A protein has these predicted regions:
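N-terminal, polar/charged subdomain of small-to-medium soluble alpha/beta proteins
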Residues: 1-90, 99-109, 113-138
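Short hydrophobic/aromatic beta-strand micro-patches
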Residues: 95-97
Length: 138
């Protein structure tokens, strides 16, 4: 099972993690990317994400399929949020289940690392004194 989603509403971490549960698996690993309140000494008010939706979903699915060929994954979910996200809000959640924890850890790391470099999602940091685009993927 592969579950790929990109949406504006809040990510429900418990629901996503529950969706990858499988009683044949001994490990579930999740990465939860949250909005922090400071970057390089500057106070962050919020983040804003924009995406080329159809391409982002396609690239996220490619990442998931690649992970399932590299590791024996039972279930995998990649959810990313767009729009304005407050401090403490979840921007991205990746959850992986596998029979063994090492495979789940490696697959989860691969997914977030690849997502950050290949998926067309752009992040803008909003500070007290201005804003800046901090990443632009191909």
């Amino acid at each position: 099972m592969i579950d790929i989603q990109l949406y504006k509403q809040s990510i429900d971490a418990t629901s996503v993690e529950d969706s990858v549960y499988d009683d044949t698996c001994g490990g579930i690993v999740s990465f939860v990317g949250t909005v922090r309140n400071i970057t390089k000494g500057k106070k962050v008010l919020r983040l804003e994400f924009e995406a080329y939706q159809s391409m982002a979903l396609k690239e996220m699915r490619k990442i998931a399929l690649s992970a399932t060929t590299k590791w024996p994954i039972k279930k995998l979910a990649i959810h990313h949020r767009t729009g304005s996200i407050p401090i403490g809000g979840i921007a991205v959640l990746i959850s992986v289940s596998s029979q063994h924890r090492a495979d789940a850890f490696e697959a989860c790391r691969f997914c977030i690392d690849t997502l950050k470099t290949t998926v067309p999602i752009w992040k803008k940091e909003i500070f007290e004194d201005g804003e800046t685009w901090v990443s632009a993927h191909p």
